[in-house]
Amino acid sequence: RDLRMSRGLGDVYKRQAKNNSVRKALDLTEEWEKATAAKGEKTSLAQGCLIVRTEFLEAHPNAVKAFLAEYKKSVDFVNGNTEKAAQMIADAGIVPNAQIAAKALPNCNIVYMTGDEMAKTAKANFDVLFKADPKSVGGAVPADDFYYTGK
């Protein structure tokens, strides 16, 4: 009944399937981009990330690169094959049926971002969280060596 209780975009579409008066009130990604553009440096709203321990990266750089390549293929597949991806999502039990997944996917903003663009986006997100409550990011914004940019 309350969209604030939704855990993800798929939940909005599940609720819409049951109650056609439920609607998407705003697009957080779009609002974030407007707010950051107004401050002179437009960035995306990062809602997920991949993390690797430095020790693992140093010991297995080729495995990390291979994983990232496969991850990019997955992102490209989901964005380029909505119907097939929707069926796979439903088959995995993430949402009750493929129709809900197909309706949700175009609004999920699933992206693959690496390098300096990723670091810039993550830093902007950390800065906002830090300004709101430094404890939310462990008391400090991560240093530049926190980000794996592939360099």
Give residue spans per PLM region.
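Secondary-structure end/capping motifs
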Residues: 57-132
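Conserved C-terminal helix/tail region of periplasmic/extracytoplasmic solute-binding proteins
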Residues: 123-151
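Solvent-exposed, flexible loop/coil residues
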Residues: 36, 109, 114-117, 141, ...
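Pocket-lining segment of extracytoplasmic ligand-binding domains
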Residues: 6-88
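Generic secondary-structure boundary/loop-capping signal
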Residues: 29, 54, 102, 107-109, ...
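Short, well-ordered junction/capping motifs at the entry into regular secondary structure
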Residues: 2-3
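Short secondary-structure capping/turn micro-motifs that flank functional sites
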Residues: 14, 95, 105, 145-146
